[in-house]
From Swiss-Prot:
It is a multi-pass membrane protein. The gene is yknZ. This is Uncharacterized ABC transporter permease YknZ. Disulfide bonds: none annotated. It comes from Bacillus subtilis (strain 168). It comes from the Bacteria. Pfam families: FtsX, MacB_PCD.
Length: 397
């Protein structure tokens, strides 16, 4: 009997017992579907987490790690560490550094007419918007003159626009920040991402924050280098420059965000694998269900097996027939599970707010594993059918 004929007979058997076949495949469907959902959402979350942490390519973060002596004299040394404009100027002159992005943040009261809210006001330098992928929903972004002159203009988040203006356009309106007037020139697009939060925020030129609120230093500095080859040398020189400026030995250091993102990616990948493996237990349960039903099928078709053997069917042919029937059952369940997994991943991603990532390797793995389950758990029933004595089988009632 040819392979196609065996597959046709297997499909006929499945269709002849629709309800039993559906119930048998249920464990496989749930198992494959749950693994697809876990892996797809896990990989999507991992990718977004890595992107959120690493930011633009070839980026390092400057941070302050006080020594034991510094902490002993000032327990708040890390929180109070800053970067001066002189630091920024020196960093821009280091070979290999493409852009120096600096900012500082303070919590302030924002008021528009009778509406008032607490907002985070971020004083930024040029390049911050672009490097951090902040896009304008309406209005305009900052000009070079805004940064140089410290114009009293600001760009606000959608949450802040909603809190102060509701459905009215904020463009051109004046918001009072700690008693200082700031004209709204733009509204940001909502930022989506695993580490993105919908906050009430305003971005203003650093020079404006300096002149209006007395802010003199930056609290955060990141460096975008020309190429990956420059990360180590430029980062080392940058840390040395800032340490020299502040009279510290090794308190200011650099952090390669891409390396951190890669490390976190490995951890999330391990977690996804563990959770996926737990979800895969239902596949084993489904496999046991397939084996039980196939054993029942062998018992029900004992006379059929006896007739086939008396007509010349070999043990190998009987074994192949029942193995293919088992594989067809699990394969159909696997394909349905993949479809449900796609839908489930899309639903979870829509609720969680990050994309799912379903690779062809995952799909192929689901198909192959389903077939493997069919072979493993179909072997016992198929072997039992193949070993039946034709005379005893023909006597079976």
């Amino acid at each position: 009997m040819s392979l196609l004929e065996n597959i046709r007979m297997a499909l006929s058997s499945v269709l002849a017992h629709k309800m039993r076949s559906i119930l048998t495949m249920l464990g496989i469907i749930i198992g494959v579907g749950s693994v697809i959902v876990v892996v797809a959402v896990g990989q999507g979350g991992e990718q977004m987490l890595k992107q959120s942490i690493s930011g633009p390519g070839n980026t390092v973060e400057l941070y302050y790690m006080p020594s034991d002596e510094e902490l002993a004299s000032n327990p708040n040394a890390a929180a109070e560490s800053t970067f001066t404009e002189n630091d920024i100027k020196g960093l821009k002159g280091i070979e290999g550094i493409k852009q120096v992005v600096a900012s500082t943040s303070e919590s302030m009261k924002a008021r528009y007419h009778e509406e008032e809210t607490d907002a985070t006001v971020n004083g930024i330098n040029d390049g911050y918007m672009n490097v951090n992928s902040l896009k304008i929903e309406s209005g305009r972004t900052f000009t070079d003159n805004d940064f140089l002159a410290g114009n009293r203009v600001g760009i606000i988040s959608q949450k802040m626009a909603k809190e102060l203006f509701d459905k009215t356009s904020p463009l051109g309106e004046v918001v009072w920040i700690n008693g200082q007037p700031v004209e709204i020139i733009g509204v940001l697009k909502k930022v989506t991402g695993l580490l993105s939060f919908d906050l009430s925020e305003m971005y203003v030129p650093f020079n404006m924050m300096k002149s209006s609120f007395g802010t003199s230093d930056f609290s955060n500095v990141s460096l975008q280098v020309e190429s990956a080859d420059d990360i180590k040398s430029a980062g080392k020189e940058a840390a040395q420059l800032v340490n020299d400026n502040h009279g510290t030995e090794d308190s200011y250091q650099v952090m390669n965000m891409e390396e951190i993102a890669a490390g976190i990616g490995k951890v999330t990948a391990i977690m996804t694998t563990i959770i996926g493996s737990i979800a895969g237990i239902s596949l084993l349960v489904g496999g046991i269900g397939v084996m039980n039903i196939m054993l029942v099928s062998v018992t029900e078709r004992t006379r059929e097996i006896g007739i086939r053997k008396s007509l010349g069917a070999t043990r190998g042919q009987i074994l192949t027939q029942f193995l293919i029937e088992s594989v067809v059952l699990t394969l159909i369940g696997g394909l349905v599970g993949i479809g449900i997994g796609y839908g489930g991943a899309a639903l979870v991603s829509a609720i969680a707010g990050w994309p799912s990532l379903i690779s062809w390797q995952v799909v192929c793995g689901g198909v192959l594993f389903s077939m493997l389950i069919g072979v493993i758990f179909g072997m016992l029933p198929a072997n039992k059918a193949a070993k039946l004595d034709p005379i005893e089988a023909l006597r079976y009632e």
